[in-house]
Amino acid sequence: MRLRKNLTNALIYALLFTLAVIWLVPLFFLIVHSFRAEPGAAIRYLFPKEYTAGNYIRLFTDTELFNFPRWYMNTLVVSLASCALSTLYVLMISYAFSRLRFRFRESMMRAGLVLNMFPGFMAMIAVYFILKAVGLTQSLLALVLVYSGSAALSYYVAKGFFDTIPRALDEAAYIDGASKSTIFWRITLPLSKPIVVYTVLMSFMAPWMDFIFASVIMKDNYDNYTVALGLFQMITRENIYDYFTVFCAGAVVVAIPIALLFLFMQKYYVEGVTGGAVKG
C-alpha cells in the first residue's frame, strides 16, 4: 500500500515537473534572446553567441518606427482606468446580488452566467459599429469602455466571497443606523481584501494583454496602439529579422508588471479564488 502511494506521488511529481519545464522553456528562451546581439529569428542554437543590453536600450530609444514608450504608457493608462471602473462595477454588482433580494434577481444572475460563457470577440463587429456611430473608434477611451463595459458579467466569484461574510454583521449595522452604502464601503469591503485584490488583478490583466479588441478598434492609428499591437508589428515579415530580439526585450518588459503583481499579491489572489468558490 505504501509502495503504491509512493509510486503514485512520484508519477504526479514527474508530471508536474514535466509541465513546469514545458512552461518555463519558452520563458527562458524569451529572456535569454532578449540579450542576444545577433539579429534574426530563425536560429539553430539556444544560447546566444554574444550578449548585449542594447535591445532594451533600442526598445526605448529607437522610436521612429516603433514608439514603444508611448505604447507602454497607452497600455498603462487604459489598464489602470479599466481596472478602476471594472473593479467598482464587479464589487458593487456582486454585493447587490449577494445581499439584496429583488424581482428578477435569479433571472439576471442566470443571464449573466450564460452571457459570460460566450467569448467577447463574438460581439466584436457590433461593438465596433457602435463605437464608430458615436465617433469613438481609434481612441483610448473606446478601449476603456469596451474593457470595463462587460466586466460586471464576471460577478460570480466576488458574489461567492460576499456570501461567506455573515449577515449578522449587516443586521448589527442596520440596528446602529447604517445604510446599505455605509455597510458596503465601511464593513464589507474592509473584510473582503482577498476578493478585492483578485478582482483588481483580473481587471488589470485583461486590457494589459488584449490584442483582438485593440486591433479592431485602433486599426492603423499607431499613436494610440497598445503594447500588444506594437510588439506584433515588430515580428511582421518585413521587420522580424531586425527587430526579433527587440521584440523579446519588449515582451519581457511587458511581463514585469504582471509578474510583480502576482508575486506580491499571490496570497490574496489564492484566498480570493478559494473564498469565492462557494455555491451562492
Language-model features, listed with the residues they occupy:
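A hydrophobic, multi-pass inner-membrane permease signature
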Residues: 1-280
